[in-house]
């Protein structure tokens, strides 16, 4: 028997009877308010994907023994839609999110889907709530696709039932008053990811264990953890973001933008990939090297002492870039330069402008922006 694929053409739409009015931009807080509708699609091992539904935002009803609650059969994505300067609504590189979502699903034995079908369905969901997509630079619609195992029973095995759902949240800028550089605690006593694990997948199970180390770092005055790994204390990620550092060779004067390689312990960030692509295109090759390589907290410390550490920042969907001003390590502070009178370094500022320009339709870059609807 052939299992039914996820099919956007079969979507059933039920419109809310209680449409919301858009909140003022000043009231938009990440993850606190949601649009009027949600997308759901059930899957069974016997039949495959059922009819997708767009319906009023509502609670889910699950058996208390559902495997998602007991064995963490759960994964998610984070992506955004933007209202552009020419009054269109676009999604930013959704194909990358769908590819990563399928990889996550395969890793924990949940069903996969045709990426284009889910992109189409998410587009239909956004169209249903298009009036709630906020307008203005820094404002966007955060999209949270989620896939959970819903099999009822306490046995640990491959789920034979699953639920795909998507909810959306109008959000404002990560930094409401401009960049705010953060202090990090280099963390070697807790591990975010390890070889053979699933640190490169967007599983909920990767996030909860990182909260306690973050609280511990916060108690010492740091905003986030700089995750280290292995006997050499390789730098991996910062908080829930990919990490970038900028070094300068004191002999040649050439600068290097470096981030950790995708070795299975690093999340394949969409923003990370975008930064690497744009840096290779737009930075002068005679002045810059773009590297994906291992580097350690020891190297950062040494290059800071030699005046070769120019900048550092995290990257992710929520903030695009998060400038770093200080790293605490073994009782010492590594100070990272910022632009005079600003809370960012020069490259982080430039990178944010590059990506914002594409997201808000000021510049084009291949097929990175996928039009959902034209509001003109």
Curated annotation (Swiss-Prot):
Protein name as it appears in the record: Branched-chain-amino-acid aminotransferase, cytosolic
Protein induction: Highly expressed during stationary phase, down-regulated during logarithmic phase of growth. Down-regulated in the presence of repressive nitrogen sources (glutamine) and derepressed in secondary non-repressive nitrogen sources such as GABA. Highly expressed on cultures with isoleucine, leucine and valine as sole nitrogen source (catabolic conditions).
N6-(pyridoxal phosphate)lysine PTM sites in chain numbering: 202
Technological use: Isobutanol and other branched-chain higher alcohols (BCHAs) are promising advanced biofuels derived from the degradation of branched-chain amino acids (BCAAs). Degradation of BCAAs begins with transamination reactions, catalyzed by branched-chain amino acid transaminases (BCATs).
GO cellular component, one term: mitochondrion
Pfam families cross-referenced by the UniProt entry: Aminotran_4
Gene name linked to the record: BAT2
Cofactor: pyridoxal 5'-phosphate
Species of the source: Saccharomyces cerevisiae (strain ATCC 204508 / S288c) (Baker's yeast)
GO molecular function, one term: L-leucine-2-oxoglutarate transaminase activity
UniProt cross-references to InterPro entries, sorted A to Z: Aminotrans_IV, Aminotrans_IV_CS, Aminotransferase-like, B_amino_transII, BCAT-like_C, BCAT-like_N, BCAT_family
Sequence similarity: Belongs to the class-IV pyridoxal-phosphate-dependent aminotransferase family.
Recorded metabolic or biological pathway in which this protein acts: Amino-acid biosynthesis; L-isoleucine biosynthesis; L-isoleucine from 2-oxobutanoate: step 4/4; Amino-acid biosynthesis; L-leucine biosynthesis; L-leucine from 3-methyl-2-oxobutanoate: step 4/4; Amino-acid biosynthesis; L-valine biosynthesis; L-valine from pyruvate: step 4/4; Amino-acid biosynthesis; L-methionine biosynthesis via salvage pathway; L-methionine from S-methyl-5-thio-alpha-D-ribose 1-phosphate: step 6/6
PROSITE patterns (UniProt xref): AA_TRANSFER_CLASS_4
Assigned keywords, A-Z: Amino-acid biosynthesis, Aminotransferase, Branched-chain amino acid biosynthesis, Cytoplasm, Pyridoxal phosphate, Transferase
